[in-house]
Amino acid sequence: MESTFIMIKPDGVQRGLIGEIISRFEKKGFYLKALKLVNVERSFAEKHYADLASKPFFQGLVDYIISGPVVAMVWEGKSVVTTGRKIIGATNPLASEPGTIRGDFAVDIGRNVIHGSDSIESANKEIALWFPEGPADWQSSQHPWIYEK
């Protein structure tokens, strides 16, 4: 099974969207493998977004991520990286389809509620950064009702 990293950003936490977001991933049939509520340090946020360090919006993004707690999660499932990105919606909420998290809950690209890994490689890197202890090793009893063998 594939894994992905999902982070509910400070605006999503402050607006009380944690349960709604978790519910959407669970209803799709994905498994929550790790979760923590974290106040992110500046140096950690800079490390997480290191690939964007040369972008003009980098410092604003870092300031946003450290402005309040985030919910960091690992989700597992078939094609969870690609499907997770579809559940989340486009980076710019105004380009996101209704029914996606950003399409339903965000209007500004600078307050777009959620982060999701954009590739398997990014997911592996982000999971290792945020969860060095690794995710929980368990399987839902619903597994055979969601996935064929």
From Swiss-Prot:
Pfam families: NDK (PF00334). It comes from the Eukaryota. Its main location: nucleus. The active site is at residue 115. CDD domains: NDPk_I. It is found in: Nucleus. One of its GO terms (cellular component) is nucleus. GO terms for molecular function: ATP binding; DNA binding; nucleoside diphosphate kinase activity. It catalyses: a 2'-deoxyribonucleoside 5'-diphosphate + ATP = a 2'-deoxyribonucleoside 5'-triphosphate + ADP; a ribonucleoside 5'-diphosphate + ATP = a ribonucleoside 5'-triphosphate + ADP. Its cofactor is Mg(2+). ATP binds at residues 9, 57, 85, 91, 102, 112. Changing residue 115 to A: Loss of kinase activity. No effect on binding to prefolded G-quadruplex (G4) DNA or to unfolded G4 DNA. Its EC number is 2.7.4.6. Signal peptide: none annotated. InterPro entries: NDK-like_dom, NDK-like_dom_sf, Nucleoside_diP_kinase, Nucleoside_diP_kinase_AS. Keywords: ATP-binding, DNA-binding, Kinase, Nucleotide-binding, Nucleus, Transcription, Transcription regulation, Transferase. GO terms for biological process: CTP biosynthetic process; GTP biosynthetic process; nucleoside triphosphate biosynthetic process; protein hexamerization; UTP biosynthetic process. NCBIfam families: PRK00668.1. Major role in the synthesis of nucleoside triphosphates other than ATP. The ATP gamma phosphate is transferred to the NDP beta phosphate via a ping-pong mechanism, using a phosphorylated active-site intermediate. Involved in transcription regulation. Has G-quadruplex (G4) DNA-binding activity, which is independent of its nucleotide-binding and kinase activity. Binds folded G4 with low nanomolar affinity and corresponding unfolded G-rich DNA more weakly. Stabilizes folded G4s regardless of whether they are prefolded or not. Belongs to the NDK family. PANTHER family: NUCLEOSIDE DIPHOSPHATE KINASE. Homohexamer. Can also form dodecamers. This is Nucleoside diphosphate kinase 1.
